[in-house]
């Protein structure tokens, strides 16, 4: 199949860019962008490669994405080696095909076609690409955004190429994401022999009523844009492994995915009040990995909806479900942020794949969005 989008996707898949190793992917993209007049600024931090590229001036539409991928798992279970892209029955197989090397290829080819037709476009077209989205994300998009904000860089619209679609390209567009807050809680007791409980203080017994009340809380009811806030216990550990020792500590890790109805400070205050109510001795550590954000109907959402309707003849759902993405960092710049990408049914799985025709369609959608906002 001879198609510039498919060919570029295959070239990217062949580079085993396990996070945060870029494995040469960005050099490939940079060469293509510089060839059509983009200025490219490499913005590497620690072990992570990033770049910021732009062409033109004025209102800015940025395309954001990541070159890194998650490990393939057991390569023997793949129908073909995970870093050897293969097309079978119209499906392109390979690690990163859907998340998100196909999107990157579609973005770059769309930019090439757009610039060829609009060499003197009125707005500024930009790219923000990182090699660490799948792992810690500490030195990726967040650091680039901080650097851009420090010099008052303008960013009006941002399209993130995360695989947002469920069954067909564009059936779901993400116009926001929930916040994510993790609590690492240690309940302190006194270790001792199970036969002498009066000489010990069992933190598991102490914490049970607290945890029972915690999991029963209805944090909010959500709103028209966000589902209700959810809290899930992810890890719980206590004990020495012996059946005759009362543990001295209980560790509990729980995560909140929260809507715009709450702030992280409101959640923290309620948890701490509950700990005090149950008179627990505790140590607590919080990790806020992202605030909730929402892009209401406006020029970017309208342009994305228009592109999907034009090429796929469907009206996309605007949703804020799912995990976090790098859009949470970009939203800090005051930009309208929307995610549009391929079908996500196989992301992070063995035999990750994407419909090759979908990537061609995605490139046309991206180009139409460019034409509506910065032509």
From Swiss-Prot:
Catalytic residues, per the record, are 68, 133 (proton acceptor)
Identify the enzyme class.
Answer: hydrolase
> Which pathway or pathways does this protein act in?
Amino-acid biosynthesis; L-lysine biosynthesis via DAP pathway; LL-2,6-diaminopimelate from (S)-tetrahydrodipicolinate (succinylase route): step 3/3
Q: What is its EC number?
A: 3.5.1.18
Return one Gene Ontology term, BP aspect: L-arginine biosynthetic process
* Residue positions binding Zn(2+) 2: 99, 134, 348
| GO MF annotations in UniProt | acetylornithine deacetylase activity; cobalt ion binding; succinyl-diaminopimelate desuccinylase activity; zinc ion binding
Cofactor binding summary note:
Binds 2 Zn(2+) or Co(2+) ions per subunit.
Residues that bind Zn(2+) 1, according to the entry?
66, 99, 162
User: Which coenzymes or cofactors are required?
Assistant: Zn(2+); Co(2+)
Which UniProt keywords are present, listed alphabetically?
Amino-acid biosynthesis, Cobalt, Diaminopimelate biosynthesis, Hydrolase, Lysine biosynthesis, Metal-binding, Zinc
This protein's record includes keyword Metal-binding:
yes
How this chain assembles, per its entry, is:
Homodimer.
User: PANTHER family annotated for this entry?
Assistant: ACETYLORNITHINE DEACETYLASE, N-ACETYL-L-CITRULLINE DEACETYLASE
Query: What function does the entry list?
Result: Catalyzes the hydrolysis of N-succinyl-L,L-diaminopimelic acid (SDAP), forming succinate and LL-2,6-diaminopimelate (DAP), an intermediate involved in the bacterial biosynthesis of lysine and meso-diaminopimelic acid, an essential component of bacterial cell walls.
The record ties this protein, via NCBIfam families, to: dapE_proteo, PRK13009.1
Q: Which family does it belong to?
A: Belongs to the peptidase M20A family. DapE subfamily.
What protein is this chain from? Succinyl-diaminopimelate desuccinylase
Organism annotation: Shigella sonnei (strain Ss046)
């Amino acid at each position: 199949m001879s198609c510039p989008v498919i060919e570029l996707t295959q070239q990217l898949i062949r580079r085993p860019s396990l996070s945060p190793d870029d494995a040469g992917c960005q050099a490939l993209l940079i060469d293509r962008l510089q060839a059509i007049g983009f200025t490219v600024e490499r913005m590497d931090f620690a072990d992570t490669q990033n770049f910021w590229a732009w062409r033109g001036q004025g209102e800015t539409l940025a395309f954001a994405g990541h070159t890194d991928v998650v490990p393939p798992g057991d390569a023997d279970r793949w129908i073909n080696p995970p870093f050897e892209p293969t097309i079978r029955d119209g499906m392109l197989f390979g690690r990163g095909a859907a998340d998100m090397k196909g999107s990157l290829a579609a973005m770059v080819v769309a930019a090439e076609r757009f610039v060829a037709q609009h060499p003197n476009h009125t707005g500024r077209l930009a790219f923000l690409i990182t090699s660490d989205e799948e792992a810690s994300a500490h030195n990726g998009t967040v650091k680039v955004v901080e650097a851009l904000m420090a010099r008052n860089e303008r960013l009006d619209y941002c399209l993130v190429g995360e695989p947002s679609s469920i069954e067909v390209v564009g059936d779901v567009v993400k116009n926001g994401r929930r916040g994510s807050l993790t609590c690492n809680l240690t309940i302190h007791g006194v270790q001792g022999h199970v036969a002498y409980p009066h000489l010990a203080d069992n933190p598991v017994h102490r914490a049970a009523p607290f945890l029972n009340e915690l999991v029963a809380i209805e944090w909010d009811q959500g709103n028209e844009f966000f589902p209700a806030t959810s809290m899930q216990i992810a890890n719980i550990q206590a004990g020495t492994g012996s059946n005759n020792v009362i543990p001295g500590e209980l560790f509990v890790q729980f995560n909140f995915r929260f809507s715009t109805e709450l702030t992280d400070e409101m959640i923290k205050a309620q948890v701490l009040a509950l700990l005090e109510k149950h008179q627990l001795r505790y140590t607590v550590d919080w990790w806020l990995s992202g605030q909730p954000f929402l892009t209401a109907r406006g020029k970017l959402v309208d342009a994305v909806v228009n592109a999907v309707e034009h090429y796929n003849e469907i009206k996309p759902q605007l949703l804020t479900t799912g995990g976090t993405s790098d859009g949470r960092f970009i939203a800090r710049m005051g930009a309208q942020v929307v995610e549009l990408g391929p079908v996500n049914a196989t992301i992070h799985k063995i035999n990750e794949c994407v419909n090759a025709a979908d990537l061609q369609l995605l490139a046309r959608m991206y180009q139409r969005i460019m034409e509506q906002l910065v032509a």
